[in-house]
Amino acid sequence: MKPIRIGIGGPVGSGKTHLVEQLTRAMHESYELAVITNDIYTKEDAQFLVKHGILPEDRIIGVETGGCPHTAIREDASMNFEAIHELKQRFTNLDIIFVESGGDNLSATFSPELVDGFIYVIDVAEGQDIPRKGGPGVTRSDLLVINKIDLAPYVEVDLDIMEEDAKQARGERPFVFTDQKRGKGIETIIDWIKRELLLEDMVKEPSV
């Protein structure tokens, strides 16, 4: 089954690329990793990871979708499948491929044929009511990440209300609050990846 493919989606500016950078930085010594990024007309996210990340350039492929970013990860994911095939040809021992979607709205989801697990990233600056508004990314993702909690006091967001709304929207599905600038919540996400996707014997549960 290797490598495990993990989709990371969310609106523009929510912190998807930064999350990929932090996950690869924290996990690269223990796992063989690669990344695919999706942008409409550029390879800017891939270039950011090459410049600021820990992985060599040949482990990062930037896909230019040329259209709706949602289509490239669901209805017509052929370019992403080609990138996955290329990475598997380059590196036969990969453990994880992160597939980052282009910035999209709350309706974005990954094809289950493309990824084994789906992490959806929102941020508190988008508004306190985002979890309540729902959408497939919020309600159906395997893990919901609520990022930029450090901004909550400045944008008048009540994290307790966001927590309750996330619980209502997601039922038993887990979610985690993060402050990626300070690394808060990253280890919880890694523990979830190890336990739920890599099927390692972990004991920690995602907490809010």
Curated annotation (Swiss-Prot):
Any coiled-coil regions, as ranges: none
Can you name the source organism?
A: Halalkalibacterium halodurans (strain ATCC BAA-125 / DSM 18197 / FERM 7344 / JCM 9153 / C-125)
The record's comment on protein family reads: Belongs to the SIMIBI class G3E GTPase family. UreG subfamily.
Subunit description: Homodimer. UreD, UreF and UreG form a complex that acts as a GTP-hydrolysis-dependent molecular chaperone, activating the urease apoprotein by helping to assemble the nickel containing metallocenter of UreC. The UreE protein probably delivers the nickel.
Q: Give an example GO biological process.
A: urea catabolic process
Keywords carried by this UniProt record: Chaperone, Cytoplasm, GTP-binding, Nickel insertion, Nucleotide-binding
Gene this protein is translated from: ureG
Give an example GO molecular function: GTPase activity
**Chain sites annotated for binding GTP:** 10-17
Query: Which HAMAP family does the entry link to?
Result: UreG (MF_01389)
Any one of the GO CC terms: cytoplasm
This molecule's function is given as: Facilitates the functional incorporation of the urease nickel metallocenter. This process requires GTP hydrolysis, probably effectuated by UreG.
**CDD domains noted in UniProt:** UreG
Q: What is the name of the protein in this document?
A: Urease accessory protein UreG
Its annotated compartments are: Cytoplasm
